[in-house]
A protein has these predicted regions:
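Short glycine-/small-residue-rich Rossmann-like dinucleotide-binding loops
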Residues: 36
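Short, surface-exposed loop/helix-turn segments at secondary-structure junctions
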Residues: 5-9, 39-57
Length: 121
């Protein structure tokens, strides 16, 4: 029934995702990746296209399925002034390492004003 058709397939897929991350962490301490496949939408615009809104977090889904710690930080703006995010992904129980790396990155990158703030204030 549904257990075999969906749940077991989902568990197998989850295991494959975790194995892929394990293989990467055998070589690397941390993975840096975009936080989303596109820049942030303008306020209210994502409600007009629910599929686009759903797909905007696709880059974080595998990390969550694998049960890995990650943190996303502002990385800059696109040519239209919309924010772009950077994701720091760590192996299991490496939260301290990714938080330290994200903090160091933010110190080097400098202040990133919120949308309601003016640049330099």
């Amino acid at each position: 029934g549904y257990y075999d058709a969906y749940y077991l397939k989902a568990l197998r897929t989850k295991a494959l995702i975790k194995q892929a991350f394990d293989k990467a962490f055998a070589k690397y301490d941390m993975i840096l990746a975009p936080a989303a496949p596109s820049t942030a939408p303008k306020v209210g615009s994502s409600l007009q296209d629910p599929l686009k809104m759903y797909l905007s977090d696709v880059y974080t889904a595998g990390v969550n399925l694998a049960g890995l710690p990650a943190i996303s930080v502002p990385a800059g703006k696109d040519r239209n002034g919309m924010p772009v995010g950077l994701q720091f992904i760590g192996d299991c129980f490496k939260e301290k390492k990714i938080i330290q790396a994200a903090y160091a990155y933010e110190k080097i990158r400098g202040v990133f004003p919120m949308a309601y703030q003016k640049e330099g204030k």
